[in-house]
């Protein structure tokens, strides 16, 4: 069996008669074959390898450009968002300050209106008291006048005769008519 294996190995290493073969044993090959193979690989493979590397380089550069554009866009959006945030914070501070000043203004207005209402109530109270005093005074006057009138009538009735009595009544009616015209 060893001979069969050796014969296959020897076939691989030795080319057939009239054909071209490649000796894979590095130590058994000569430098000319190696240089020819390397030269052919470099000559024909250089273009393919160069194209592959150029394509890869272009894809990497495009990816970098796209990433840079995306980064610039993200930075612009971030700056816009920061500007909007600053604007909103300023507006919020203004609303807060305006809210506090509005609260203070409303508080001041409420206090003032309360004082005005209290003053009006005090005036109404004083007017009511004055009105009631005047009414009480008028009632007392009327009662005193009625009592004086009744007393005078009683005195007159006891002292006067019928004719004098009629003249006195006529005079009093005339006085009441004159008083009524003055008060109207």
From Swiss-Prot:
Main location: plastid
Keyword Transmembrane helix listed: yes
Pfam families cross-referenced by the UniProt entry: ATP-synt_B
Note: In plastids the F-type ATPase is also known as CF(1)CF(0).
Membrane-topology annotation of the record: Single-pass membrane protein
Similarity field: Belongs to the ATPase B chain family.
GO CC list: chloroplast thylakoid membrane; proton-transporting ATP synthase complex
Subunit annotation: F-type ATPases have 2 components, F(1) - the catalytic core - and F(0) - the membrane proton channel. F(1) has five subunits: alpha(3), beta(3), gamma(1), delta(1), epsilon(1). F(0) has four main subunits: a(1), b(1), b'(1) and c(10-14). The alpha and beta chains form an alternating ring which encloses part of the gamma chain. F(1) is attached to F(0) by a central stalk formed by the gamma and epsilon chains, while a peripheral stalk is formed by the delta, b and b' chains.
Name used for this protein in its record: ATP synthase subunit b, chloroplastic
Lineage: Eukaryota, Viridiplantae, Streptophyta, Embryophyta, Tracheophyta
Domain of life of the native organism: Eukaryota
TM annotation in the entry: 27-49
InterPro entries: ATP_synth_b/b'su_bac/chlpt
Compartments it resides in: Plastid, Chloroplast thylakoid membrane
One example GO MF annotation: proton-transporting ATP synthase activity, rotational mechanism
């Amino acid at each position: 069996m060893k001979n069969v294996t050796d014969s296959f190995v020897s076939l691989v290493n030795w080319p057939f008669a009239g054909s071209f073969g490649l000796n894979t044993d590095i130590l058994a090959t000569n430098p000319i074959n190696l240089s020819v193979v390397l030269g052919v690989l470099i000559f024909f493979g250089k273009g393919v390898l160069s194209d592959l590397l150029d394509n890869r380089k272009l894809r990497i550069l495009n990816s970098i450009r796209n990433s840079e554009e995306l980064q610039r866009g993200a930075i612009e959006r971030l700056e816009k968002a920061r500007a909007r945030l600053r604007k909103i914070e300023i507006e919020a501070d203004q609303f807060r300050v305006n809210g506090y000043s509005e609260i203070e203004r409303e508080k001041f207005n409420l206090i003032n209106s309360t004082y005005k209402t209290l003053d009006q109530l005090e005036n109404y109270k004083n007017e009511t008291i004055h009105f009631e005093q005047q009414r009480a005074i008028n009632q007392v006057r009327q009662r005193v006048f009625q009592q004086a009138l009744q007393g005078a009538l009683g005195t007159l009735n006891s002292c006067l005769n019928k004719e004098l009595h009629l003249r006195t009544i006529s005079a009093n009616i005339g006085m009441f008519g004159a008083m009524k015209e003055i008060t109207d």
